[in-house]
Amino acid sequence: MIAAPFDAVWQSVIQTFFDRNIPVRTLEKASGLVESDELHGEIGRDCDCGSYLGIPIGGYGGAYGGDAYYRFRVLVESRGSETALTLRTTCRGRHEGVVGDLVCTLAPAREEEVRSSIRDRATAPR
């Protein structure tokens, strides 16, 4: 929960996406939904795709490099004088030695950067 009205949180989501060059795919203020287009990153830096035989896949000394693709989905809901913010992410990885996509998770730090930016903007004194 964020101790700010819906409109302040909504504007914070829009401003955060703009400042971080996150392209918007869906923008529906009536339902409180914002979804990004797919962003390109790096396995190991932006997404965790697990390990193979105990060796991390990609990044930070991993044996396999690769591309990561991820999205943000944000739901903003009014709860009286406060606003609920739900942030969900999807992430997949690709590597030339693997058939199909790897199922990955977005790096917690990357998700927290977006969440805290929205929260800090919404609660900043005006």
List where the protein language model places each region.
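Ser/Thr-rich, low-complexity intrinsically disordered terminal regions
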Residues: M1-R126
